[in-house]
Regions:
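Noncatalytic alpha-helical scaffold of FAD-dependent oxidoreductases
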Residues: 1-250
Length: 250
């Protein structure tokens, strides 16, 4: 903002995520340099304004002694964006289960959130990456673990709980995009005080007195870690000679 620049996109990836993507793709973001956190900045507008903003931005980067790459073609831009797009696919190769949290914190608290993730990764010996929308403080924290490993699963749950408490301490919210649904119900009371909670329950009861609209969501505690993994198949994923899969019931 001090530069008078309003990027259309501002995406962040921490060092661990960058290392993960580079290992997955076999490509270096900054050739010849060790992995660093990455901030993807995209400008839009008319050609004149983009050129002016680009000059100001590059000067700020140089004055700050930061390494940067400038995309001078669509092909180069796609190469840089691949780092962001490959974040989730790269992490899926590390373990069979992912807890993907879309927490959001005030802009000036993002560094504290990232530092918290680094501490959790070390303390709990887990594969945890953080990336996301730096422009609005909505960062995705991905906990990778193997579901059948009870010790690792327990560590993932404890680390996630610590993350949610930290988000609350920083004045943030447990969901910036995906909503509460089922998986976040164990943490939702961290975000709302008793008065807010009772108000929401009263509104729910007024609009849905018989509890038929999206039953079990938000207000009923649901423990996702006690649930068995559910595998679904689609009709076009098996031949007509194969027996139809048994319906999934709950």
């Amino acid at each position: 903002a001090r530069l008078g620049i309003r990027p259309s996109i501002l995406e962040f990836l921490d060092k661990w995520t960058v290392e993960c993507v580079q290992s997955f793709t076999g490509k270096e973001v900054f050739a010849g340099l060790s992995p660093h956190p990455v901030l993807l900045i995209e400008l839009d507008g008319d050609p004149s304004s983009i050129e002016t903003e680009s000059v100001h931005l590059q000067k700020w980067l140089e004055d700050s002694s930061l390494c940067y790459l400038s995309a001078d073609s669509n092909e180069k831009a796609e190469e840089l964006w691949e780092v962001r797009r490959k974040g989730s696919p790269a992490m899926k190769k590390l373990a069979n289960t992912k807890l993907n949290e879309d927490v959001v914190v005030p802009l000036n608290e993002q560094i504290n959130l990232v530092e918290c993730v680094h501490e959790l990764r070390s303390e709990f010996n887990l594969k945890i990456g953080v990336f996301g929308h730096c422009g609005d403080g909505n960062l995705h924290v991905n906990f990778m673990y193997n579901h059948e490993d009870q010790d690792e699963s327990s560590r993932a749950v404890e680390a996630l709980t610590r993350l949610m408490k930290k988000v609350h301490e920083l004045g943030g919210a447990i969901s910036g995009e995906h909503g509460i649904g089922l998986a976040k119900t164990p943490f939702v009371r961290m975000q709302f005080n008793d008065a807010e909670w009772k108000t929401m329950q009263a509104i729910k009861k007024t609009l849905d007195p018989h509890g038929i609209l999206n039953p079990g969501k938000i207000f009923d505690i649901f423990n996702p870690w006690d649930q068995k993994k559910i595998t679904t198949t689609l009709p076009w994923e098996h031949s007509h000679d194969e027996p139809e899969p048994e319906p999934v019931t709950s």
